[in-house]
Amino acid sequence: MEREIPPELGLHAGLHVNAAVEGMAEEEGLHLLAGAAFDHAAAADVARGEGGGAEPCGGGEVNMEQQVQEGHVLDSGEGPSCADDRDKQEKKESLKEAAVLSRLTVNLMSRPRLETVYWQELQDEFQRGDMHLQYKYSFEQLKTHWLEPWEDMECAIKAFAKLALRPDCSYRITKTVTITSCAYIIGNGAIVEVDTSDRVAFRCRMQGMGPGVVGLDGITFINVRFAGDKFKGIMFEANTCLVLHGVYFLNFSNICVESWNKVSARGCTFYGCWKGLVGRPKSKLSVKKCLFEKCVLALIVEGDAHIRHNAASENACFVLLKGMAILKHNMVCGVSDQTMRRFVTCADGNCHTLKTVHIVSHSRHCWPVCDHNMFMRCTIHLGLRRGMFRPSQCNFSHSNIMLEPEVFSRVCLNGVFDLSVELCKVIRYNDDTRHRCRQCECGSSHLELRPIVLNVTEELRSDHLTLSCLRTDYESSDEDDN
């Protein structure tokens, strides 16, 4: 039987009670909670010791050859069973991992903090008119509510605003969570599984007037891992300010984030998703230090976007640029599987094959700023835009650049690394091969235009016999002269 833990003053009620951490737990109480977390593992070890007498294969090996030489005949049920021992070893490791997560949870929940006020108290004070147009409290003073897996997340966000998930638990979203006020969700690495038939999992709506807290603005998710194997809808639908900090999106078959307002994604990971970040017209995307891997469309930009310091690998399309953007210090690797290239886009009225970096034609938009990027085994599509496309200090390693018919005179490649780049100009489209129907990024299927191209690499490549590489095009302000 498990021993009972006597209650102590100032100690959190336990891991299975819904209560906020208000007081500072004593060191003895922390040891008691950690000991309680190990009771289940210890009981399981004792039960295994009494039930089975066979030792693991790695620990107590039986010399079967010596027993056969001595005339001992082994029965069918005698001797070690490696398969059973492996199962026991896996169970033991899983129990150890659970114990580590339990200790981590205890440590996080019992750590002393300067939390003094609840969100509801701030709202009451705001209703009385005491907090209009002023910031009276800071983020660390707002009390944290530790969310239990059985609680309603939408109601908890309205009541507490600042939520923390337990790393030793997994959460399930079974209905749409509508957020209409400030929210700050701290994931602590917890896994949130989305299992609902609704169209949207998190609906982030416009926010009204409310109390001002320094460090709490808009809707923020930090260090949460979302799993969408069972979900077919949109993960985030936001028309308000949304910040995603260190969030993981794993195996989503639809859109991860769809925004009509400002969205900031920092240090996020998108793995095996259909569409990562989609910025609708008049939206503002800020994507930096994110990882995109094995996605079909990582980024779709219809408004403005700042895309910096990201890494992408094995994506059918890293960025589909319909609006305007700034691309700096990104590292993009193309796909090795040719089946990932069988998508088209109809963004400019013509069905072109979707490339790794696809810049759509637009009569009023300027070319994107493209500096200090690494493109490896990429295909790049350049549609017609205003001005000149002049990438600076970009490495086009084993990459292919496709130019639409009128783009040839608007591209300048002075100042790039062009040893293994190949440029092709579209002469016309072959009508005889329009029978191929491909899946489009808009959701339907279209007939693909197969272009007839002309290699213009040497016409656009810099004359290295005339232009020296020891010029300012390849230098940076932070480089030393010596």
Swiss-Prot record:
InterPro entries: Adeno_E1B_55K_N, Adeno_E1B_55kDa, Pectin_lyase_fold/virulence. GO terms for cellular component: host cell cytoplasm; host cell nucleus. It is found in: Host nucleus; Host cytoplasm. GO terms for biological process: symbiont-mediated perturbation of host apoptosis; symbiont-mediated perturbation of host ubiquitin-like protein modification. The keyword Signal does not apply. Residues 83-94 have a biased composition (Basic and acidic residues). Its main location: host cell. It holds the Pfam family Adeno_E1B_55K_N. The modification Phosphoserine is found at S476, S477. GO terms for molecular function: ubiquitin-like ligase-substrate adaptor activity. Residues 73-94 are annotated as: Disordered. The keyword Phosphoprotein applies. Keywords: Early protein, Host cytoplasm, Host nucleus, Host-virus interaction, Modulation of host cell apoptosis by virus, Phosphoprotein. Plays a major role to prevent cellular inhibition of viral genome replication. Assembles an SCF-like E3 ubiquitin ligase complex based on the cellular proteins ELOB, ELOC, CUL5 and RBX1, in cooperation with viral E4orf6. This viral RING-type ligase ubiquitinates cellular substrates and targets them to proteasomal degradation: TP53/p53, LIG4, MRE11-RAD50-NBS1 (MRN) complex, ITGA3, DAXX and BLM. E1B-55K probably acts as the substrate-specific adapter of the SCF-like E3 ubiquitin ligase complex. Interacts with host PML-4 and PML-5; this interaction promotes efficient subnuclear targeting of E1B-55K to PML nuclear bodies. Interacts with E4-ORF3 protein. Interacts with E4-ORF6 protein. Belongs to the adenoviridae E1B 55 kDa protein family. Contains a PML interaction motif that allows the subnuclear PML localization. This is E1B 55 kDa protein.
